[in-house]
Each structure stands twice: as structure tokens, then as C-alpha cells.
């Protein structure tokens, strides 16, 4: 199924509506409470809409995203709340335009207590919440008790970032040196193992990929070819640009590989069918006339939901 006109700012409403429906279903008389759905929210950092294999890209392979899109709903026209990371994420978790959140909608500013993200509502209703990687950032959160107006803790939930990759060793499993050290999947598994039996969960998987800086030429050892690339018309069609886009693709695939592992894990423990899975990006690719610009490749992002 394909929906063509749903902007990203309505994600919050859709999530809360689904969760609220589950909560209300368990409050009628003396009926057995309905099992509330889990939520896995996966958001990449700087990825344009065209760059998934489900969308037809020839140089990006995203089996994790494709699985969600194939089994659920794929949105062909989803637009981020901003072409920049922090404002877009602020809009997403509050359901408001980022400028309505004042400084809590501005890049690297302070997050004020008055702006309540939906994760707080989920936690208050009994959900187990957490995040790994990049949360609702970059923002400044309360550093000490003197920051009385600032929020204490990330607006994505409680951090689970213990597990890391070791760099510059022979067993470094990362496919490019520019990839972050956070082991997203292992942190998600740790989160799940600490959950109480039967407790519904909400988990924010925030990959730091495919944000720059890239390892130049990483595509060469990852089985990619310059002739695979579809260069957007606003960029020069040169070997340099094609190689840069392939390095970008390597990082998208890394983030997607962790999503695939999370889906497999949920399937193995019998929770996938009761989990709302949302996969998207905050804004477009980090290239000229894309990220930080209100052109199509700056705000048009991938978006798929399955349940």
C-alpha cells in the first residue's frame, strides 16, 4: 500500500493514536486487558527519500527497510519538519513545527521542560523506553540542578550506548572508518533483556549514519561500482561525486544492517508481530542543494511503517 500525502509531522500522532487505542481497549469493564503494541522507531541521520532499494535505487541495498515497507505501508511523499537534524527531530517528537518549540526547535540549543516529547507520555502509561545512538540531538540538556528550566535527559528516552566497536584493530567489523562506534544492535538487545516480562516497550534506534565524514573510497572494498550510481541532476556527474555517493551508500547499508538484526531478534522472541516498526530519516543527504536546504533532496525522506 502506498500513501502519497502524509508529512512527517504526523508521525507522533499516528504512534500515540495506536498506543492509546491499545490502552483504551484494556479499560472496558472487566474484560481481559488487550496486549499493548511495542514500538521500534528507527531514524537515520541525513538520508534522502530515493536511497533505499525499495525506492528503486541501484547503488543502495536496504533489506531491513524493504522488509518493513513490503510488510506494511510505504510513504512515497514524506517530508521532514526541517532540512536540519535538531529542528526536524524536535518537530517529530512534539508534533509541532520546530519554530513553535522556540529554542527547543533550534540546532544545538537548550531543550526546555515545557516542550514534552511523546516518550514521556509512553513512559507514564507504563512503557519501557530507551534509545541508542543519536537521540533527539544536537540539543543541550540539564547539566546540573542549576539548569532548572532545562530538561534532564534526552527527549528520545533513556540511553543504551554501552556496547561499542573497537577501532583500528583487526577484528573491527565496521565497513568504513567514518562509521560510528556504537553497536546499535547489541545495545537494543541489552535493552530488551532488561525489560520486565510482558511490559510494552518503545525504543528509538538513532543511527549516526550516513552523516559525514565518510571514509573516502570505502565503496571500493564493499563491492560497489561507479556505474551503479544515479546522480541527481543538481550535482555534477563526475567520478568524484559518484564515489562520494557510494561512500554515503556504504553508511546507509551499515545502519540498515543493524535494523535487520533488530527485526530478526524481535521475530525470534515472538514480538515482531506485536511491534509497530517505523523507519525514516531526519532530513536529506549531506550534499549541496540537499541537507540544510528546503529543496526536495533536503526534506523528502524515506518512511515506512509495519504492524
Residue locations for each model-derived region?
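Formylglycine-dependent sulfatase
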Residues: 2-3, 7, 15, 19-307
